[in-house]
Amino acid sequence: MAGHSKWANIKFRKGVQDAKRGKIFTKLIREITVAARMGGGDESSNPRLRDAVKKALNANMKRDTIDNAVKRGVGGADGEAMIAMRYEGYGPGGVAILVDCLSDNKNRTVSEVRHAFSKHGGNLGTDGSVSYLFTNQGEILMASNQPEDKVMEIAIDAGASDVAVEDSQVEIITPVEAYHTVLNALQDAGLEVEQSHLTMRAQTLVPISDETAESLIKLIDMLEDLDDVQEVYSNAEFSEKILESMN
């Protein structure tokens, strides 16, 4: 649990910091537009849009900017025709990596992703080469100063598949189809949710050396800095020393 949740916390904080510098607003707007185009502009019936809007609000994006992105998506004809793509590969130490992208130019995107892998000791794989090592799930993180029995009861009753408590945090894992039901149940009960998102969660984390971790982090950072890249997932288990250094 710790490897997953601590890495999620670090990525969340990094995302907020990047948003303040304007680095990820373009990606968030793109995700909102595509989600609205694919599933309509009603957040209540479009889980992907609801999740994208939540990310944007967490990054302090103005509601007018979000609404305009939704309108562009629903309008359909305006703007670029974005395509969702997923690339799979191996990083330093044989770590499995998934890269989710939204792009209007597949050739540009694959070239940039391949270059990042090559530069930092990895290699791009074929479809299916590592995706079987991950499961699409919902992840909800809460502070553990809330009544644990109540959190567990509500989460499990609403469809959560696992609830774990460690240190100062409660981590709730859900099937994709139960994610919003569980999240709404917790919030309706007046419980405070620190983070929530849909993610590709590694089924098993692979321990790596600190030296390998440093190379892997450079690769992940380079991938995440690409305009077309939306999310990067890996099955690496980082040491406490590395996690602390990233805080």
Swiss-Prot record:
SUPFAM superfamilies on file? YebC-like
Q: Name one GO cellular component term.
A: cytosol
Q: One GO MF term, please?
A: DNA binding
**Where is it mainly found?**
cytoplasm
**Top-rank lineage group of the source organism:** Bacteria
Keyword annotations for this protein, in alphabetical order, are: Cytoplasm, DNA-binding, Transcription, Transcription regulation
Q: Which InterPro entries match?
A: Integrase-like_N (IPR017856), TACO1_YebC-like_2nd/3rd_dom (IPR048300), TACO1_YebC_N (IPR049083), Transcrip_reg_TACO1-like (IPR002876), Transcrip_reg_TACO1-like_dom3 (IPR026564), YebC-like (IPR029072)
Q: Where in the cell is it found?
A: Cytoplasm
Pfam hit, one? Transcrip_reg
For the biological process aspect of GO, one term held by this record is:
regulation of DNA-templated transcription
Q: Does Transcription regulation show up as a keyword for this record?
A: yes
Q: Give the protein family.
A: Belongs to the TACO1 family.
Q: What is this protein called?
A: Probable transcriptional regulatory protein LPC_0711
